[in-house]
Amino acid sequence: TATQATYADLAEKYLGDADYEPRTVMILGGSAEVTQSDKKNSPAIAGVVTTNPAHLMNEGLEGDHVVAIALRGRIPCKVKGPIRKGDVLIASDIPGHAEAAPFKGYQTPSVCVIGKAISEHLQMSEGIVEILV
C-alpha cells in the first residue's frame, strides 16, 4: 500500500515551555518536555519545530504550549553562519538556531546532530535552510 502527502516530514506533538515559531531548534528540557536550544552542540536535541507535517503523531495532545517537532523528513531550520549542502548541523549558541559542525579533527557525537543541510546559506548572518532530519 502506498500513500502520498504534499508535505515532507513526520512530526510528533510535545509540550513546550512557551510558544515557539516553526524552524526553531528544540531540546529536551525546560519546565515542560521541550524548550528551544540555547547551548552550542547540545546533546539533548529533540528536533526542529515543523511548518506543515505530512503526518502528525500524538495529535490529541493538549496543553498551553504544544509544539510539533519534525522527527524525520525535510524541513526548514533557523541557522547561524555559513551552511553548505551536506553540512552536518548542531545546535548553535544563538537560541533556537543550528550551525555547521566543525570537521577539522572533530567528531560530532550522533546525539548532537540535528540533521544535514539540503540547501545553503553562505552569509555569516542568521538565515533559514532546508534540512534532512
Model-derived features: positions:
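Extracellular receptor-binding modules and their adjoining Ser/Thr/Gly/Asp/Asn-rich linkers
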Residues: 1-133
